Regions:
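Second-shell loop/turn segments in exported
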Residues: 24, 90-98, 123
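Preference for bulky hydrophobic residues occupying beta-strand positions
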Residues: 75, 91, 235-237
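Active-site metal-binding loops of divalent metal-dependent hydrolases
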Residues: 91-93, 126-128, 231
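Short, solvent-exposed loop/turn segments at secondary-structure junctions
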Residues: 22, 42-44, 53, 80, ...
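Metal-dependent phosphoester-hydrolase catalytic domains
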Residues: 99, 103, 113-122, 130-241
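Divalent metal-dependent phosphoesterase catalytic cores across multiple superfamilies
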Residues: 1-13, 100-118
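Structured beta-strand-rich core segments of catalytic domains in phosphoester-bond hydrolases
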Residues: 1-87, 189-193
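Structural detector of well-ordered beta-strand residues that form the stable sheet scaffold
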Residues: 13, 39, 89, 123, ...
Length: 241
């Protein structure tokens, strides 16, 4: 869709139905399928593909006790400034099946070891459906090949966790959306962006007059909403030569 296009970038991943795109890898059965929203700058891609988070990785299916088929998309790139190669993985682990999350984590770490050379940088992102206190999280950070960018960032802005259930009033310390990177990647900044937008209510047309503020200030009551049930997570990182 033109609204989702970014100049100089293209979409990566498996496309099962034209016109449907999910920002997080998601598959609701075979009738409502997906295309991943991995972005790349044109001219940098070396290769790309995907595998299913399952015992059978090469075709759509549900793995272990998962409620839905789940997938991981990857891209292999050449950084034009450093001339170093790097890999980008994006996944969505199951929200119901505990075993599926456990085995998916092991599978992804094994795939990274299998596919990526030791000196190539790795970035792994997505909705993991496990927070930083869950034992499955340690599968990634204890692997020796991945670090949590939240922990290694030079500067951090995280006024909330990453899941909001479409309710901007909720507060949590849980981060279930992660950006893992190779330990050698320098993370300058990490942020959870908690911006909201406003929608009208029945009372929006009435100006609020009472309060300790200048009379020229015009205030109206609107409902705060989040564009997603997850907050965006952003990092600024550097590949060291």
């Amino acid at each position: 869709h033109p609204a989702l296009e970014h100049p100089g970038h293209a979409l990566l991943g498996a496309s099962f139905r034209a016109g449907f795109l999910a920002h997080v890898p998601r598959l609701h059965g075979h009738r409502h399928c997906q295309r991943h929203a991995g972005l790349r700058r044109s001219g940098r891609r070396l290769d790309d593909g995907h595998f299913w988070l399952s015992e059978i990785t090469d075709r759509p299916n549900k793995g272990w006790d998962a409620a839905l088929p789940r997938i991981c998309t990857w891209g292999h790139f050449l950084d034009l400034q450093t001339k170093r190669r790097f890999w980008f993985f994006n996944l969505h682990m199951d929200h119901i099946g505990v075993q599926a999350r456990e085995e998916s984590a092991k599978l992804v770490v094994a795939k990274i070891r299998e596919m990526c050379k030791p000196k190539e940088f790795v970035i792994l992102t997505g909705d993991f459906n496990v927070d930083q206190n869950n034992h499955i999280y340690t599968t990634f950070v204890s692997s020796g090949i991945l670090a949590d960018s939240y922990e290694t960032a030079g500067r951090r802005y995280a006024p909330n966790g990453t899941f909001n259930s479409f309710n901007p009033s909720l507060k949590t310390d849980s981060r279930i959306d992660h950006i893992f990177v190779s330990p050698s990647v320098r993370v300058h900044d990490y942020g959870v962006l908690t911006d909201t937008y406003r929608t009208e209510t029945a009372a929006s047309g009435e100006e609020i007059k009472s309060g300790a503020f200048p009379k020229e200030v015009s205030l109206h009551s609107y409902d705060a909403r989040t564009p997603s049930d997850h907050f965006p997570v952003v990092v600024r990182l550097e590949f060291r030569r």
